[in-house]
Amino acid sequence: MPRRDDIKKILLIGSGPIVIGQACEFDYSGTQACKALREEGYEVVLVNSNPATIMTDPATADATYIEPLTWQIVEKVIAKERPDALLPTLGGQTGLNVAMDLDANGVLEKYGVEMIAANAKVIAKAEEREQFKQAMDKIGLDVCKGFTVRTLADARKALAEVGLPAVVRPSFTMGGSGSAIAYNKDDFDSLVQNGLDQSPVTEVLIEESIIGWKEYEMEVMRDCDDNVVIICAIENFDPMGVHTGDSITVAPAQTLSDKEYQRMRDASLAVIREIGVETGGSNIQFAIEPDTGRMIVIEMNPRVSRSSALASKATGFPIAKIAAKLAVGYRLWELPNDITQKTKACFEPTIDYVVTKMPRFAFEKFPEADATLTTQMKSVGETMSIGRTFQESFQKALRGLEVGAFGFGSDPKDLWGTEDQPSRDEIRAKLSTPGSERVFYIRYAFKDGMTAAEIHSLTNIDPWFLDHLQQLIETEDNLRAIGKLDAIDVDTMRDAKRRGFSDRQIATITSKTESQVRAKRLEMGIRPVYKSVDTCAAEFEAFTPYYYSTYESETEVPAKGDKKRVVILGGGPNRIGQGIEFDYCCCHASFALQEMGIESIMVNSNPETVSTDYDTSDILFFEPLTIEDVLNICDAMQPDGVIVQFGGQTPLNLARGLEQAGVPIIGTSVDTIDTAEDRELFSSLIDELGLRQPPSGIARNMDEARVEAKRIGYPALVRPSFVLGGRAMEICYDHSQFARYVAEAFIVADGQPVLIDRFLEDATEVDVDAISDGNDCVIMGIMEHIEEAGVHSGDSACCIPPFSLTQPVLAEIRDATRKLAARLNVVGLMNIQFAVKMEGTQPTLYILEVNPRASRTVPFVAKATGVPVANLATKVMAGKTLKELNVTEEPIPRHVSIKESVLPFRKFAGVDIVLGPEMRSTGEVMGVSELFSIAFAKSQLAAGTVLPESGKIFLSLSANHKEAAESLGKSLIELGFELLATEGTAVRLEANGIAVTRVKKLSEGHPNLIDYLKNDDVQLILNTPSGKGARTDEGKIRAAGVQHGVPCITTLAAAEAAVRAMVAMRDTPMEVESLQRRYAQNV
């Protein structure tokens, strides 16, 4: 085979932290690529900053560097490892941009590193808007009329040619960052300036608007012999104007005529050849004007993308794996198809089912943000479903979103027929403006008597889709007319199930319970069957067990053999509070079961993840995580147990229902999980063990809440029970705040009680992850938080080993952990959050909460210590003892590891960025060094907070941080920085002999801090808030800082750590080291 033997060592650059526009799909593609290249005998060096990935496991690559993704840091890795080649196309936009920077700064030439799959010229031709336009003109393909500009003056000239509305698109960004639609000249100027700021090359394209056109994507692969195949054609349900990452998408394309498809296919082949992507996958986006059929090319990603992951999962064709092998010289016809084992990769996949992807949003976390969907991506996750028909697939996707919908209406989310039923005017407004709820308003429009033609005129959604949704309403109306469950006959029930109606919807329509509908359905002999995802529409036998459910006659799942079977329930779509960290745990659970000779069965609905790769588990079910879908799988597979500990809140919410249906839950019991969540039971348990908790109470209504607040006192922490990610959690400092926040907490709690705790001000928060086998408990990691208590643990930076806790406090933490594990009879993972508060001269330990499940810190602990925490916990749950696994001592590394959170504020203009008890981060990074200060500096750099070496720093600390302001000010002056401050802080600093330039508050006129930001004349903002919210002066300053790309630190502890890091960076260079070498030094 003609694979390249002149290359021995290959560098892969990962995509960094999970952010909006770039999520787990790049962990999936990078992991596949590492496996594929090592399979071929190449040595793989990986650089990535995200510890929560399978890609950064020490077993995935030969040398793994968890380091910031800047060209300067990657150069140090290259100098140390001396790779022969760099594969830049599998790390998303981040990896591509770092590769381009390495090339532009002469690093690749200096060390003789060859870029494979796509070189810098090819990447620039695809990514730079003007070059791409010229390339399309050359091959006779139409593009939007547009002009590439680098200044606002040139943008205004372009607008005169293009006209309004106009689309602003920055070059070299992902997830549509900085892209927007301008409807008037005033907006245009600010949108262009923002676009220029966000483009790493300060370049934007001003182009004609094609809002309302139909949008399509083609996934294309090419090898070095110029063989090109189309993997998948994807159609956007939402028309142009909504970023494809925020659109509902369907595969295969449903509304293209054969002639249109062939024209688009021919164009795709021409594009990939003209741009010159030598090998691998590319994603090409098209728009079609529905009335004239005019087709234009929108853009091309010369790399594996979010859509590539979707196309891989939709077809079963492993795009990233094949792309990696093509990059080292293989041809498509030489590579076997893993699924059929008979066909080759040059066979274009054919599918006999319909796939629907739906985006998941988090606007509830950012109430001040504009929730309109535009050309800039805002969704934080997605779910994918597979069905035999569009209707079945569409309804399964809606229930896979986990937003309270169990299909297209007739469920707890449905407003129709309630007191909140929208009016005709509200419906028309929601249809004409794209938003996350628009799909539900299409239902209300039909229920209100609007026609498909009227809905099309308001939404531009293709009539074919609307006709199918109208048929779902007709089926629902038919069921309502029948009325009683017992009156529904077999044919009607089967027809409803084939159209994707859930038992929950039928229960709502017939006023019965879900379990009654399930019993009736089973009595009728109506069960789902499971079909294979096989790449070939059943033409060849499939050898990889990858299944979806549908209501037909013949099932394809294998009968149970001699092996034990265990089901792992995944986490569903990413959301803030439940993301890649839990998928990491699910993957390790599967690997551990396989090592023990137990058949692992993965159930998940997230197309971005490694857990839904067909070779992560023995059997994969791509299904929504609802009680109905999971019980159906358990009926078909007869597992010996189900793991609910690893997928976050989603599987925990199903645990009780599964247990009641007779499904065995392995590991910690459901009763223990409930005890830890039940405030009253847990409080009495804490008292029984002689441990401390902050004073707390529980309220089921507003009157009880007032009584509890009076007893507990302020500041008080208010939160609903049974939620993840601190949803609707707030700190209240007085009664008026309390009344406002408690009302919201009751809405979110949805019938569950609201919890009220005394908030411990100025306490240090500590996270502990441990494994217990029911007898012994071993601590895996003690993490000290850098931000004080009150910032959600998911948003706070934390450090292993702890940096300020005394040995007596650590001993007390260890003792409390063991007591709790024993009393709760934990089998598997456990996470405890402690707070240490100085009371007089003595530190006092409080227990904040206990979670007898995987926490989001498990991957970080595993990377910091080198211990495969989730793998060991799974083996304990499957019956091994810690002694049998030789796990007896807490691992304490010699190096310092700091986890830092990454926040999405740049996508939500105008939102105040102050951190609080509700989690808002989308991802995380890790900084590693022998020194705390350098590890912290690395974590900041990796998270995008570039600590400056010179320039101006705005310092504004609240009144209770006076002394800290003085010491920070002195340190910054000694480092050579110039200080800016408003009146109050300036007076304090000057009184202590610290030179400062005064700036006016926004309300006082000019020059104020926003003027400095606009002039690029401030490099860092250190601001601890005295007030919160985007409407305050401070809030506006913080939000403006984010939009201008200026780092903004809002807690005193982080500000002090940042100044320590800036001092250390003067004297100590950032060194890089692989995890494998670090772990060897710990032994």
Swiss-Prot record:
Listed binding positions for Mg(2+) 1 are Q285, E299
GO molecular function, one example? ATP binding
InterPro entries hit by this protein = ATP-grasp, ATP_grasp_subdomain_1, CarbamoylP_synth_lsu, CarbamoylP_synth_lsu_oligo, CarbamoylP_synth_lsu_oligo_sf, CbamoylP_synth_lsu-like_ATP-bd, CbamoylP_synth_lsu_CPSase_dom, MGS-like_dom
Please provide the record's keywords in A-Z order. Amino-acid biosynthesis, Arginine biosynthesis, ATP-binding, Ligase, Magnesium, Manganese, Metal-binding, Nucleotide-binding, Pyrimidine biosynthesis, Repeat
Region called Oligomerization domain, residue ranges: 403-557
UniProt binding sites for Mn(2+) 1: Q285, E299
Does the record bear DNA damage in its keywords? no
Entry's PROSITE patterns? ATP_GRASP, CPSASE_2, MGS
> Where is the stretch described as Allosteric domain?
945-1083
The UniProt annotation places Mn(2+) 3 binding at Q833, E849
Kindly give the HAMAP family that the UniProt entry links to this protein: CPSase_L_chain_A, CPSase_L_chain_B
What this protein is called in its record is Carbamoyl phosphate synthase large chain
Native organism is Rhodopirellula baltica (strain DSM 10527 / NCIMB 13988 / SH1)
